[in-house]
């Protein structure tokens, strides 16, 4: 079995997790493999020779990107030159599409096989990016089934590999154990998850707390848990709690424990909605953006839904209350019946979980090696 050289580039922590799982699965099938590129500590632990620290690519927000644009473009140009000289058997760009899609295009033009792992949201907005993907990508690996259908329609070779979260989150969470670990009793528990970024928490935090106060009047004995992404978010929430008498427990991280312990969730639109679905917890999804941003996105976004549960179900499975519709009264009134019985949501959640549970890393490794079998 000839040695395989695999180049990978991941730009953030979630990509490092995906990349390390894929590397492990590739080594199990093809032990003589060398890994080069850019990744984090998990990928380096699996044997990646990383050309520079992944943190140099982990930039969020338009202002931050503009501030580092020259460095990012210089690093990408150098990376393309290095990889063309190295001639790996395959290049795998993991998420980070604004950085990796251009690399894939240049390497494919140089005769190197290219794979993109994790689809950008081209099905929702900036759909013309699919033209660049079709030109630069030999294979797209998607985590979600509706993404694969979109690429098939667009003539892009694709494989739906499943979602790693669906592999790691159990089909049935142990609610009593999670409650015991968090010191919660028998009564109804609602998780409040207003997001992990400062702007999100600034727009949704007080709104969620107002809704919780209203919910106390509708659901006797209800308690709340709110997982804080970091110390800064915790301080932000603590400031919002001043003068309130809510039966609320703040958690440091522990979002999965909060989801396992609760009966229902009030949640910001984002990846956390998929986690809530996988824990089979009924939810109400809310989101608020700056008015101008919302106005622009409303005209750009092609999808009728914003939350992953509804995109996966292809219908309004969970209530979405956006912008002016997201009032504390509406949130509490919509959530109260779900605390008592959310089975209409959770039965479909179970079906979706089983669809997504496909052993993603091994599926991805098989797809990559199948692409290379004629090399």
From Swiss-Prot:
<dbReference type="GO" id="GO:0009245">
    <property type="term" value="P:lipid A biosynthetic process"/>
</dbReference>
<dbReference type="InterPro" id="IPR003835">
    <property type="entry name" value="Glyco_trans_19"/>
</dbReference>
<keyword id="KW-0808">Transferase</keyword>
<comment type="function">
    <text>Condensation of UDP-2,3-diacylglucosamine and 2,3-diacylglucosamine-1-phosphate to form lipid A disaccharide, a precursor of lipid A, a phosphorylated glycolipid that anchors the lipopolysaccharide to the outer membrane of the cell.</text>
</comment>
<keyword id="KW-0444">Lipid biosynthesis</keyword>
<dbReference type="GO" id="GO:0005543">
    <property type="term" value="F:phospholipid binding"/>
</dbReference>
<keyword id="KW-0441">Lipid A biosynthesis</keyword>
<dbReference type="Pfam" id="PF02684">
    <property type="entry name" value="LpxB"/>
</dbReference>
<comment type="pathway">
    <text>Bacterial outer membrane biogenesis; LPS lipid A biosynthesis.</text>
</comment>
<protein>
    <recommendedName>
        <fullName>Lipid-A-disaccharide synthase</fullName>
        <ecNumber>2.4.1.182</ecNumber>
    </recommendedName>
</protein>
<comment type="similarity">
    <text>Belongs to the LpxB family.</text>
</comment>
<keyword id="KW-0328">Glycosyltransferase</keyword>
<dbReference type="GO" id="GO:0016020">
    <property type="term" value="C:membrane"/>
</dbReference>
<dbReference type="GO" id="GO:0008915">
    <property type="term" value="F:lipid-A-disaccharide synthase activity"/>
</dbReference>
<keyword id="KW-0443">Lipid metabolism</keyword>
């Amino acid at each position: 079995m000839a040695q395989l050289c695999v180049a990978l580039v991941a730009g953030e922590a979630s990509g490092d997790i995906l990349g390390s799982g894929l590397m492990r699965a590739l080594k199990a099938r093809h032990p003589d493999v060398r890994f080069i590129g850019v990744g984090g500590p998990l990928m380096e632990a699996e044997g990646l020779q990383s050309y520079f620290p992944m943190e140099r690519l982990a930039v969020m927000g338009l202002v931050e990107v503009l501030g580092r644009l020259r460095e990012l473009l210089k690093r990408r140009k150098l990376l393309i030159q290095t990889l063309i000289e190295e001639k790996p058997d395959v290049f795998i760009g993991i998420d980070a599409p604004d950085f990796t899609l251009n690399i894939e295009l240049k390497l494919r033009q140089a005769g190197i096989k290219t794979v993109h792992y994790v689809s950008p949201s081209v099905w929702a907005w900036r759909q013309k990016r699919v033209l660049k993907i079709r030109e630069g990508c030999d294979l797209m690996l998607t985590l979600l089934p509706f993404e694969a259908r979109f690429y098939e329609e667009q003539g892009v070779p694709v494989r739906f590999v499943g979602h790693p979260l669906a592999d790691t989150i159990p089909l049935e969470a142990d609610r009593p154990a999670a409650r015991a670990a968090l010191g919660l009793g028998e009564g109804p528990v609602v998780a409040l998850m207003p997001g992990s970024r400062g702007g999100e928490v600034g727009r949704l935090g007080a709104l969620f707390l107002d809704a919780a106060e209203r919910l106390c009047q509708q659901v006797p004995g209800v308690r709340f848990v709110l997982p804080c992404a970091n110390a800064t978010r915790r301080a932000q929430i603590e400031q919002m709690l001043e003068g309130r008498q809510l039966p609320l427990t703040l958690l440091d991280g522990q979002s999965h424990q909060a989801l396992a312990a609760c009966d229902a969730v009030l949640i910001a639109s984002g990846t956390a909605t998929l986690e809530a679905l996988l824990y089979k917890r009924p939810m109400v999804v809310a989101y608020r953006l700056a008015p101008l941003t919302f106005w622009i996105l409303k005209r750009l976004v092609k999808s009728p839904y914003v939350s992953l549960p509804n995109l996966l179900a292809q219908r309004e499975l969970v209530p979405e209350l956006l912008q002016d519709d997201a009032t504390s009264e509406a949130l509490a009134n919509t959530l109260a019946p779900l605390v008592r019985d959310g089975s209409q949501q959770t039965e479909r959640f179970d079906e979706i979980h089983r669809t997504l549970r496909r052993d993603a890393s091994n599926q991805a490794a098989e797809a990559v090696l199948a692409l290379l079998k004629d090399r």
